[in-house]
Amino acid sequence: MSLHIATLAAVFVAMRKEILALIKHPICKQTGLILLTSLPTAIIAAIVYFLDVDLSSLLGIGFAVTALMLLFSADLKGKKDISVGSALIIGLTQGLAVTPGLSRSGSTISMSRILGIEREKSITYSFLVSVPVIIGSFLTDALKGGFSFSSYMLAGCASAFFTGLLALKFMLKLFDNPKAFVIYLTSLSALVTLNDLFFKMF
């Protein structure tokens, strides 16, 4: 639970201008698009949660799909704005990121660029639509296990917050040159797949 709080705080710090603008003017096109994106995400998450679907066997596939999306979208140029249709497709992509190994931010940013949305808008939008996801995950965990606070939780929050900020900076640099990360993900995918098929070591 502390991870959700820290991740949300990191996103708020990184996207403070955009989030404050939405708080000041909540009734706007951007809010509507974020809600549209959240809809298919919530539906997929609810199906997986209530049906207790085990997706652990898809870890290798998740790594491979993330690598392919990053590679395919790396050199794409776009000038389009986010439309109703693209918001829903991004939401579907975000929902499918419940699959282990499939990066939520990597897949949503890549899909945005595939849809013709320019790089900076894609990154900003991906971080903004993560806010409802993080809040939803926090509430789900709180309803399941209750909410408690301790000094250990505070220390965990602080550690996760700074780790989250570093991860956000890494993601921003990643999309300048994702090829090294693509090689890393492809190697992970091959390792996990070989393990699942032959070795069963982990």
Each PLM stretch: what is its role?
Residues 1-100, 104-202:
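Multi-pass membrane proteins that catalyze or facilitate reactions on polyprenyl-/lipid-phosphate substrates
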